[in-house]
Each structure stands twice: as structure tokens, then as C-alpha cells.
């Protein structure tokens, strides 16, 4: 999103088509004279990406297709630029992925990436990743030695991510999400690699050892999945010390960070 917003500021010459699925929140972006948001039907994400997306790129006469989330169509007649955030899924066997503690949706996503990414890397004119560490890992894994093909560009940070000092704004966000006076903030999901289980165990141990009144605030986390993890760490009473915020608007995050 920040990439698109900043391109809108600096480029009024070239035409951009932003392809999105109908179920995505496209209101976070505003069209301009040379930036058009195109909603594409196409069913589940794999068929949308592999069939609907390349057809649309051809229909709108795109010179380049830039895919920003690890995967991309590999039947494509125009140059492709792909962003690979990491390749953790490539380092696990299909059996290990299936036996992992991830949700069915996450397992399917990792299998899809494992199938698609090698083809996409080969197809791409340019592969971008988010750090030099990942660049080295990707280069070694796929045998890419050409710096013209593989590059590291750090993630940008939105301008609204800064300490919030306004008492009115802090109070508004605190009330909106029922935040306690003292809390730790956990931003993650149910994927095992996010280490949620150990975070909960550490928080449980912290409370037992210190008697602290701190709460653990968890953003947009499923309560059923949380209860499963609490059973696994043998501390179901910990739920009393956890605040589940539900969905949080991106622009409210700085105020949550500022109060934790």
C-alpha cells in the first residue's frame, strides 16, 4: 500500500493498474488519473493469480507485472518482478507442512508457495527481498548469483507509525479496544512460526513469578485457537489476563504501541 501511495506522489506520467480480488478492502487506496483499481473475479486465490491475473495484465496492455507477496503467475508474456519476503516454506517437506500445527488454510498456502515459488523465481526478471540476510538465503537456495536479478530493498514504514503523544487520541484508542492500563502487545497469528505458544508460556511464567497486573493484548486473534494453546501450556486461567481486540484499524496501531 505504501509503495502505491508513494508512487502516486512521484509519478504522474506512467499508467498503473492495481489488480485486487473483490473481497479485498480496496478503500484504503484512492484512484488517481493514472492509477486505476481493477477488481478481478477469479475464484480462490490460486486460480485468481494463475488465470485471471495474467489475462487482465494482457487485457490492459501492461508492460510489467509486479507481484508483492511471494507468488505470481508463471504463464505470463510480459516481464515479471516478484517480491519474496522469505522462503521458510521452501525449507520444509510437504509431509512436514501437512503435519505442522498450522491451520488448514496456512498449510494450503505453504504448499501452494512451495509449488509455485521455484517457477516464479526462474520466470522473474527481477526478484526483490526485504533484507540482505534473505537475499543471501534466496541466492544460495535457488542458485542466483546475478545481483541484477536479485536485490534487497528494506521495507518502508508508513508515516503514521510514530509515537503518539496526544492524550485525546490515546484515550480514544484505549476506549475503542478496551485496553488496560498496563499491557504487553502481541502482534502475530496462528502460524507456528510466529511462536505464539511460547509467548503465552512466557507470559504465564512472568505472571506467576512476579504477580504483575499486566495484561497481554492480542490483535485479531481467534479465541478458539487461543484456548487450544492455553490447554497445551496447562494454563487455561491465563485467558483472564488476555485482551482480544478483534480487528484493529492500521492507523490505530501507533496509539496501541505507544501505550504498551
Explain the meaning of each model-derived region.
Residues 1-260:
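Carbohydrate transferase catalytic cores enriched for Leloir-type hexosyltransferases
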Amino acid at each position: 500500500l505504501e509503495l502505491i501511495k508513494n508512487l502516486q506522489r512521484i509519478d504522474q506520467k506512467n499508467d498503473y493498474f492495481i489488480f485486487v480480488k473483490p473481497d479485498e478492502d480496496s478503500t484504503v487506496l484512492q484512484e488517481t488519473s493514472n492509477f486505476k483499481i481493477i477488481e478481478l473475479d477469479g475464484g480462490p486465490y490460486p486460480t485468481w493469480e494463475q488465470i485471471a491475473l495474467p489475462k487482465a495484465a494482457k487485457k490492459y496492455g501492461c508492460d510489467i507485472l509486479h507481484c508483492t507477496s511471494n507468488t505470481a503467475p508463471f504463464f505470463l508474456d510480459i516481464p515479471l518482478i516478484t517480491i519474496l519476503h522469505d522462503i521458510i516454506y521452501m525449507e520444509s517437506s510437504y509431509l512436514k507442512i501437512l503435519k505442522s500445527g498450522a491451520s488448514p488454510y496456512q498449510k494450503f498456502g505453504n504448499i501452494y508457495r512451495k509449488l509455485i515459488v521455484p517457477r516464479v523465481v526462474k520466470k522473474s526478471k527481477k526478484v526483490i527481498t526485504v533484507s540482505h540476510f534473505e537475499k543471501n538465503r534466496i541466492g544460495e537456495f535457488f542458485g542466483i548469483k546475478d545481483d541484477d536479478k536479485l536485490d534487497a530493498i528494506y521495507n518502508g514504514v508508513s508515516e503514521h507509525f510514530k509515537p503518539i503523544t496526544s492524550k485525546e487520541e490515546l484515550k480514544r484508542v484505549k476506549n475503542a479496544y478496551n485496553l488496560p492500563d498496563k499491557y504487553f502487545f502481541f502482534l502475530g497469528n496462528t502460524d507456528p512460526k510466529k511462536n505464539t505458544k511460547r509467548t503465552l508460556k512466557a507470559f504465564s511464567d512472568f505472571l506467576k513469578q512476579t504477580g504483575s497486573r499486566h495484561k497481554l493484548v492480542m490483535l485479531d486473534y481467534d479465541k478458539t485457537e487461543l484456548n487450544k494453546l492455553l490447554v497445551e501450556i496447562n494454563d487455561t486461567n491465563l485467558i483472564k489476563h488476555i485482551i482480544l481486540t478483534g480487528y484493529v484499524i492500521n492507523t490505530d496501531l501507533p496509539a496501541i504501541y505507544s501505550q504498551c
